[in-house]
Amino acid sequence: MTRFPVTSLRSVDLGTPVIDRAERFYTSVWGLEVVIRDQGSVYLRATGSDHHVVALHAGVRPELRAITFRVDSADDFAALGVTVAEQGGQVLSPPGANAGPDGGTVMTVRGPEGGLLRFAHGDRQLAPLPQGGYRPVRLAHVNLNSIDVDASATFYEKALGFRLTDRSKAMAFVRCNTDHHAVVIADAPVNGLNHVAFLMPDLEAVMRGAGRLIDAGFPIAWGVGRHGPGDNVFAYFIDPAGFVIEYTAEVLQVDDS
């Protein structure tokens, strides 16, 4: 059975110029809950045990500030630091106590394309919440635009221990557990965030959630449909700051034992 040093996608940090509107949207419409507000930032949880899945930070423009993954063991930090450097990344802060509300130990690196990646171990877990008919459980994946898909995929494979699951003409799908993909890398003229996907309990939850979004004045940007790679159901929307976000469910599970 494959061992992954990185075991899951946990959260994203988003800068937004409309943080009050964004908080209302993600809590009243999208189905997340506030965990804590702290100095211009809002931490939002889903129904799963992750301390938060989105951290909103007041800023002058919409931007992806960081992606946080969880590592299997504190012993994995040292090896990741070496392979990140070997593959063109940079360790910005070595493993140390996390001053954020999620606690634990965190290491921060910059990938070859400039994005910040955080790796957490021993971070705070919360008691799961009842799964409502339209509420996300956790993050499913992030989709990143890249000027060099193959180079980006290679970094995730060789530096971070992900495995390539699928490769289409324009996208690479890499995973760090049995989910078909945790990161998608899409061919684009500039590097950056394409979208963030939230896992829903099932197809019915995607449909119910989509209905709530439409009723609240947020039309479906694309969907409801089913992707080829990953076989997952999808519905895409645009949040108040312009970020593309996705409800998804029924993600293909990969068994390579």
Each predicted region: which residue ranges?
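Internal, well-ordered alpha-helical scaffold/interface segments
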Residues: 150, 154, 158, 191-194, ...
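Conserved short beta-strand elements that form part of the metal-binding/catalytic scaffold
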Residues: 32-65, 115-123, 165-194, 199-203, ...
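Conserved active-site tyrosine of GNAT-family acetyltransferases
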Residues: 22-27, 84, 114, 152, ...
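N-terminal beta-strand motif that seeds the catalytic metal site of vicinal oxygen chelate
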Residues: 1-20, 64-69, 122-150, 163, ...
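A cross-kingdom feature marking solvent-exposed beta-strand/loop segments within repeated
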Residues: 38-41, 50-105, 127-128, 179-183, ...
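Core segments of cupin and vicinal oxygen chelate
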Residues: 4-51, 98-99, 105, 144-182, ...
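Helix N-cap motif at beta-to-alpha junctions
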Residues: 18-19, 72-76, 202-205, 241
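Vicinal oxygen chelate
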Residues: 2, 85-135, 172-173, 218-257
